[in-house]
C-alpha cells in the first residue's frame, strides 16, 4: 500500500491533545520521498501542554490504582494491534520519515518486542521485595515502587515510532501518565502509535500527544513533568538536563554518537563488508547507533576497503513502498546540507571518496549516496563531529591497541562494533571500549534488540538507560519500608541506657557474621 490517505491523517489528527484544532496555525507535513505535501499538523502551545498535564494527572491517579497485571494486559493488546496493523505502520513511516521499508520494519519489530518484554516482566520488577533488615528476625525491610506521576517524553524524527511509543510503554506500565512531544517532522507516526494504545484500552487522557515546536511545547513539558525522557542531540540534551536539574526531577537521555567499528585480522571480510553496509547506512545513517568510523588493521585495510566499497556501490536507493530498496532518503534540507557539507569539506582537504559522494536529486529531493571516505584527518569536520547521515570513514591502524585508543578518542560513547578473528578476542576488545553498547560480530541490532539489557551512552552520548529493568524502574520512586517487629534501638525495658549503648556494637558485629550477611 502506498501513501496513507487524507482520511487517515484526519482521523489521526483528531487524537492530538489540542482542543481547537481548526483555529490553529498549521505546519505542512511532506512526503519525504517526493517533497509533495501530505497533510498539515496544528501547532501546539504551552497552554495545550498545561491542559494535557491537568487531565493526565487526574487520569494517572486512577491508572496507578489498577494492578500491574491489568496495565500489562493493555500493553499486550497494543502489541497485538501493532502486529495486525504492521503494513499501515510501515507505509506511514516511509511516507513521513523517508525510510526504506526494511528500516521501517525494524521499528515495527521493536514496537512489538518492546511491548512484549515489558508486559512480561513488569509485574515481577514492580513487586515489593524483601531485603536484608538491620536485625534479622527482629526487623523487616521491604522495597516498593511508586510511579513518578506524569512523565514527559520529547522524541526525535529519525525513529518516530520506536522512540515515542517504546519509551512510553514502560512508563505507562509503571503506573505513570505520559505527555509527549513528537518531532515536528513526524507527528503522525506518534499519533498512529497512540491510536493503537487507545484501541487497546489505554485511557486517552493518560497518554497525550502535543505537537509543536521544541522551544514552546518541549520547554513546557520539561517545566511540568515529574520525569523527563529525551532523545536527540547532545547540545539540546545538556540544556534540558540543566532545566530538569533546576526542578530536581529525574532525567534520562539518549544523545549523539560518533560510533566506531574495529576490524582485525582473521575475519571474513566479505561477511564484514556486507554487515557494515547495514551498520553504517540503516535509515540513511540517521540512526544514533550507526557506525561513522571504521578502524581496520593495516594488513587487511586495502582488501576491506575494496570489498566494502563494492558493497556500498551496489546498494539500491529508491522510493518504493516495498522491500526492493536498500536505502531511503534523508529527512530534510538541513540533513542534506550537513552531509554534503561534511563530504565537500573533507574532499577539499584531501580525503578520498571510495564510494558515493554526491546528492541524488534524480531519485528524490533529499537523497544522498551512501558515502565512504579514506584519508580523513582531524581538521576535517566529519572526523570528530557526528554527521548523522550516510557517511563513514575508514582508518587503517597498526594493531588492536591503536584501534582501541582511537575508538575511545571521542567525547561520545554510545555504540561500537567489533569484528575479530575469534569471538573471545572480539569480546575482550569490546570490554575495553568506552561505549554504552558494544556489538561483537554485528553492527548495532543485537545490543539494541537485547531488551533485557540496558541501552544508553557514556560521555556526552547520554544519561540513564532505556531497556532492561532500568528502563522501567527509572520511571518509579523506590520506597523503603522498615519495620521494627520486636523492639527498636531504644534500650529494652530494664536495661540501663549505658549498658545498652555498650552492647550495640557487639550485637551489630555478631549480626554481620550470621549466614547470608555481607
Swiss-Prot record:
Catalytic activity of the protein: succinate semialdehyde + NADP(+) + H2O = succinate + NADPH + 2 H(+)
User: What keywords are assigned to this protein?
Assistant: NADP, Oxidoreductase
Read off the PROSITE patterns from this record. ALDEHYDE_DEHYDR_GLU
Highest classification ranks of the organism: Bacteria, Bacillati, Actinomycetota, Actinomycetes, Mycobacteriales
Q: What positions does the entry give for NADP(+) binding?
A: 157-158, 181-184, 232-233, 255, 386
* CDD domains assigned: ALDH_SSADH2_GabD2 (cd07101)
* Annotated Pfam families: Aldedh
Q: What is the name attached to this protein's record?
A: Putative succinate-semialdehyde dehydrogenase [NADP(+)] 2
Amino acid at each position: 500500500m502506498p501513501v496513507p490517505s487524507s482520511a487517515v491523517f484526519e482521523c489521526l489528527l483528531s487524537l492530538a491533545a489540542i482542543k481547537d484544532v481548526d483555529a490553529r496555525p498549521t505546519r505542512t507535513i511532506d512526503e519525504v520521498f517526493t517533497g509533495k505535501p501530505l497533510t498539515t499538523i496544528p501547532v501546539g502551545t504551552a497552554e495545550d501542554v498545561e491542559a494535557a498535564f491537568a487531565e493526565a494527572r487526574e487520569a494517572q491517579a486512577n491508572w496507578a490504582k489498577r494492578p500491574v497485571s491489568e496495565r500489562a494486559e493493555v500493553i499486550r493488546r497494543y502489541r497485538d494491534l501493532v502486529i495486525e496493523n504492521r503494513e499501515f505502520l510501515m507505509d506511514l513511516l516511509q511516507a513521513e520519515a523517508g525510510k526504506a521499508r526494511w528500516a521501517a520494519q525494524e521499528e515495527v519489530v521493536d514496537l512489538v518486542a518492546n511491548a512484549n518484554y515489558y508486559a512480561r516482566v513488569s509485574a515481577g520488577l514492580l513487586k515489593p521485595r524483601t531485603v536484608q533488615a538491620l536485625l534479622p528476625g527482629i526487623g523487616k525491610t521491604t522495597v516498593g515502587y511508586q510511579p513518578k506521576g506524569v512523565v514527559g517524553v520529547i522524541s526525535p524524527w529519525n525513529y518516530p515510532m520506536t522512540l515515542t511509543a517504546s519509551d512510553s510503554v514502560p512508563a505507562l506500565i509503571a503506573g505513570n501518565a505520559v505527555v509527549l512531544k513528537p518531532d515536528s517532522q513526524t507527528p503522525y507516526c506518534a499519533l498512529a502509535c497512540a491510536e493503537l494504545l487507545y484501541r487497546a484500552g489505554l485511557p486517552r487522557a493518560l497518554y497525550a500527544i502535543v505537537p509543536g515546536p521544541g522551544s514552546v511545547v518541549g520547554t513546557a513539558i520539561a517545566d511540568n513533568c515529574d520525569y523527563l525522557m529525551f532523545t536527540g542531540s547532545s547540545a539540546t540534551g545538556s540544556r534540558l538536563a540543566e532545566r530538569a536539574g533546576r526542578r530536581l526531577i529525574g532525567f534520562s537521555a539518549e544523545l549523539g554518537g560518533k560510533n566506531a567499528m574495529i576490524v582485525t585480522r582473521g575475519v571474513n571480510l566479505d561477511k564484514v563488508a556486507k554487515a557494515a553496509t547495514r551498520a553504517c547506512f540503516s535509515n540513511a545513517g540517521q540512526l544514533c547507533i550507526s557506525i561513522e568510523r571504521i578502524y581496520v588493521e593495516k594488513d587487511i585495510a586495502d582488501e576491506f576497503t575494496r570489498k566494502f566499497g563494492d558493497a556500498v556501490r551496489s546498494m539500491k536507493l529508491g522510493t518504493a513502498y516495498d522491500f526492493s530498496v536498500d536505502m531511503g532518503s534523508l529527512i530534510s534540507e538541513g540533513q542534506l546540507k550537513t552531509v554534503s557539507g561534511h563530504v565537500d569539506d573533507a574532499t577539499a582537504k584531501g580525503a578520498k571518496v571510495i564510494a558515493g559522494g554526491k546528492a541524488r536529486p534524480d531519485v528524490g529531493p533529499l537523497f544522498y549516496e551512501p558515502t565512504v571516505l579514506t584519508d580523513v584527518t582531524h581538521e576535517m569536520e566529519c572526523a570528530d563531529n557526528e554527521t548523522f547521515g550516510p557517511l563513514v570513514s575508514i582508518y587503517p591502524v597498526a594493531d588492536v591497541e591503536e584501534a582501541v585508543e582511537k575508538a575511545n578518542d571521542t567525547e561520545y560513547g554510545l555504540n561500537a562494533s567489533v569484528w575479530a578473528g575469534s569471538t573471545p578476542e572480539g569480546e575482550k576488545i569490546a570490554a575495553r571500549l568506552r561505549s554504552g553498547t558494544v556489538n561483537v560480530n554485528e553492527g548495532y541490532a543485537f545490543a539494541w534488540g537485547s531488551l533485557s539489557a540496558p541501552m544508553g551512552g557514556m560521555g556526552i552520548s547520554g544519561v540513564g538507560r532505556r531497556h532492561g529493568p532500568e528502563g522501567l524502574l527509572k520511571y518509579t520512586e523506590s520506597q523503603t519500608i522498615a519495620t521494627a517487629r520486636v523492639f527498636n534501638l531504644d534500650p529494652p525495658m530494664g536495661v540501663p541506657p549505658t549498658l545498652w549503648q555498650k552492647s550495640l556494637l557487639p550485637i551489630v558485629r555478631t549480626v554481620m557474621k550470621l549466614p547470608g550477611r555481607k
